[in-house]
């Protein structure tokens, strides 16, 4: 290097070793593999040479590499820079609704959507179960609302439909029914609860409940169509029909953190021990298919029922997409797509959502940033910082209301709404 070295924030240049070192908070320095170090340059050069050798044909001419072309094309279309404040334009796209009627100290956590009655179901850390009906504004321009909202044209009608004595561990909704599970306490064991929401009265009826003692600690739940609901917990999965009766118990050999229904009686479970288990509810076996992810699994999302593709998010910096039709041959299969930019190294439950047709999905990170990907692009096309970083977005849902569509996420004492 000729002349003075470049000044890089957070690094200093050692003239004897002719390389950069990273400065850590305690004042010491450690070698860092970045784009300015010799090791990084040598590794990149060696990787490029290996790639060229692999892409050569018999005649010595380079063969067209579709994956390289696809990645370069995706990278060139990525419009944002990680150090640019434009990444976090939340004023125009992300709206925050403060629910003033909620008591001080209330923190919303779970969300579900009742499609038939166009109602959002919310749960709080204190055990509140709230119904939030989406209604359009009157023709006179006066909003028909039971509380005051700030900074949004959306209109909500909020009502409390239940109160749980124990913390609510999971919430799921189908067309008309609400299903939630509660964690065990010193006085009570884990339980499940089922009720039907009455839109006219703004309350729930046909209430049923039961014990989940076999699960020890319920952790997640999923609607499985006409068969009812599936609840995942400590080393087991319980299948409960719509009448509130336990119909089946499945072994998982690991704590189940996420459940997804793929249709055709297939249920997929993501576990703490990095395994993804596929169950066929028509059989009595433990599981019909098993494969392993790169890290402990936190959230999953299915993109399409006709061509079952599964998004898997774990305690790592990427989200993987698997094709469930080609997972039988290998214990550690290769994902068909990896989505970079995700950040989740601390939390178990963070929001992972998709839109109606599965072409766009979103994920919340432990750095208080919402990221949005297109399923055919490995880099996020939009990133938005969530407010001041007080609360993590642990759950979210795609909502198709009468006056618009978008993602809704519970956040503290309010809601975050993003309309693409």
UniProtKB/Swiss-Prot annotation:
WD repeat start-end pairs: 251-289, 293-332, 341-383
Keywords noted in UniProt: Cytoplasm, Nucleus, Repeat, WD repeat
Superkingdom classification of source: Eukaryota
Classification lineage: Eukaryota, Fungi, Dikarya, Ascomycota, Taphrinomycotina
One annotated GO biological process: transcription-coupled nucleotide-excision repair
Name under which the protein is recorded: WD repeat-containing protein 21
One Gene Ontology term, aspect cellular component: Cul4-RING E3 ubiquitin ligase complex
Pfam family, one: Beta-prop_DCAF4
Residue numbers covered by motif DDB-boX: 73-75
Species assigned in the record: Schizosaccharomyces pombe (strain 972 / ATCC 24843)
Record localization: Cytoplasm; Nucleus
Domain writeup: The DDB-box is specifically required for ddb1-binding.
Intrachain disulfide bonds: none
